[in-house]
Amino acid sequence: MRKLLNLLLSLVCALWLALPCAAATRQPVSQDYIDKYFTSVAAASCLGVYLPEDSTEFNYLRAYGWRIMPQKLRSGRVETNFAIAHNYFPELKKRIFLVTFRGSANKKDWSINLRTHRVNYGGSTLAEMDALAKEPLRKGEPAVHSGFNAYVDTVMRTSVLDDKGQLRGVFKAVAERSDAIMILSGHSLGGAAATLLGQRLLDLGMPPERLCVVSFGAPAVGNEAFANAYGSRLRLLRITNTADPVPGSLQTFFGGYKQFGQHIKYSLSPQISNIQHDMAMYFDYSVGDFYNEYDRQVALGRIFPMSDRKMTVGKPMVALWIFESENLKKLATIMDLKRFVTDEYKRMLPSYMVMDKSLGKDAYAHQDIVQKSRFAGADYILICGIDGYRQPQADGWYLTLDQALFDEQGRMLTMSSLGRKVLPAIGNVQAVGESLMAARKELHAQLPFVLVQFEPELWQK
């Protein structure tokens, strides 16, 4: 049962990105709701960009309509790794372009981080920017980290500007289309690159209302004069946590740097970790943060929660039984994993009914579950279990997901059991995401009506 549980956990990842949100709206949802939704999407992309060719997170986003194009480009000694994605959201009547920069992953990346001396910042063309950066540092004037500046310069030359120094590609499209918004995002080095590129794009004429930056655990990019002169121009959601030393590292060890932007700090208990910079942790928190805002919108009557019963004409009814172990309840997971799993299954099944939600592990024998499901009108019975197992004298725990599918007579059609080790502060949603992809694929093979591709939406109609 433990392994079956982990598969369920995987469903968590899918769930939140799919937004199990509202069935209808009464009033417009808050900007916080929209911000937190896209923050969680950006967090998934920040994980995916580390392994762009074999990424569960990218595959999950693609299932929800995101078109993703990984990029790996080089100019001189600098190599850039990022991904460009886009999707259309009818609720906003906007096409969202998401550009995600990878954090530090090798020695070349760290060589960029360690080029901590500053260069002048300014100019409205690439030529002006380059010329100013080569001049002797001007005291009291805006200046930025030379390594980050070189990284962004490479991105601009290879992907942002044409031979005439004009915006091209998706950057040109966003600048010219009133129905487009660009989100620049990244973790650590990637977050610094996203922030500095955002400022460069504004200098090159990008309308500020069409641009937002979401950074996770990113160091400062410039000095106090830079923050004061340019910080208010760029909409920056700067996300850190109470145990991450990286955002303050340049100020602490080198001095002369200053952060700016809307600071969002996740509170990480010292009992979980004293130092935590991993992107997987930020992913967990961003999903949990979104769900908190979702619940707030429900309480305000702006959206309605997903029903525990749904019927689609012509689609078989599936009785959904979800079990959560007592062990899992005792673990310091950031989110309610059972809720994530349940919501994700709701998304996959055109017709479903959630059975006794308070059901304990040994509440009913198998024949009782079959009888109750048949009495309720089910054509199929899907039983899932989530568990968390801590090994003695070991860090972290194993999250397991078990999934078993039966016909209405109680005959087993398929069963899966998956598991993955995670650390106390990281990896819960990521582990669930990996299991989800396998679980959904197996269910679809048995039941072709199970959905594997979804329309992007901020809330369900």
Predicted features along the sequence, with ranges:
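Bacterial N-terminal signal peptides
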Residues: L8-P20
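Boundary at the C-terminal end of the N-terminal hydrophobic targeting segment
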Residues: C21-T25
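Serine hydrolase/lipase
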Residues: P28, R95, T125-A133, A143, ...
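Short, surface-exposed "cap/lid" segments of acyl-processing enzymes
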Residues: E79-N81, P90-D130
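Gly/Ala-rich beta-loop-alpha elbow adjacent to hydrolase catalytic centers
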Residues: G186-G190, A194
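A structural "domain/chain start" motif
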Residues: A220, I303-M353, F449-K461
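C-terminal/domain-edge helix-coil "capping" segments
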Residues: K310-V318, F375, F406-K461
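Surface-exposed short loop/turn segments
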Residues: Y364-L413
